[in-house]
């Protein structure tokens, strides 16, 4: 039963805890006095609203900080105004009504790509020049690639395709260039007949 109330601390739905609030406030004040003596920041708003026994509130205040980030008063000193902390605790209560602690979803972090947009004009001009140079280089490379592909096609036409039937080769290749050995006039096939080889 105690764990259930610890998970739902600070919610207005906690019923039957009004009797314990007086002891919580006393325990919260004792905790603040201890933190002032040690020189640590006091936890103001949340301990008054929590609604648990005073001893548990003190143990929780001295232990690990809450992961859900509900204690806004952690970073403040005792000397700051109390109405401000009460206003924050009221806004926290409204936020707790909207979404329970179990459904807590962290906010999205800022994307790192947005940081690079604030460059100086000098850097942006240099980047533009680099991009322009790189685009020219890409155009040259593209032209080189097309030339290389054309040369490859010519070589393939000259050398002959060994996997294409001979009748189809005749239409593609000029008359004197048909043989693999480069014999003038063709001189027959350059390789042994593959049709005569027995299948394994």
Swiss-Prot record:
Q: Which UniProt keywords apply?
A: Nucleus, Transcription, Transcription regulation
Protein location: Nucleus
Keyword Transcription regulation tagged: yes
User: Where is the segment annotated Disordered?
Assistant: 1-200
Gene Ontology CC: nucleus
- Bias (Basic and acidic residues): 1-49, 61-85, 94-106, 114-153, 190-200
Q: Which Pfam families match?
A: BEX
> Key word Nucleotide-binding present in the record?
no
Show the disulfide pairing: none
Q: What is its main location?
A: nucleus
The job of this chain, per UniProt, is described as: May be involved in transcriptional regulation.
Q: What family does the Swiss-Prot or TrEMBL record give for this protein?
A: Belongs to the TFS-II family. TFA subfamily.
Give the protein's recorded name: Transcription elongation factor A protein-like 5
**Species for this entry:** Mus musculus
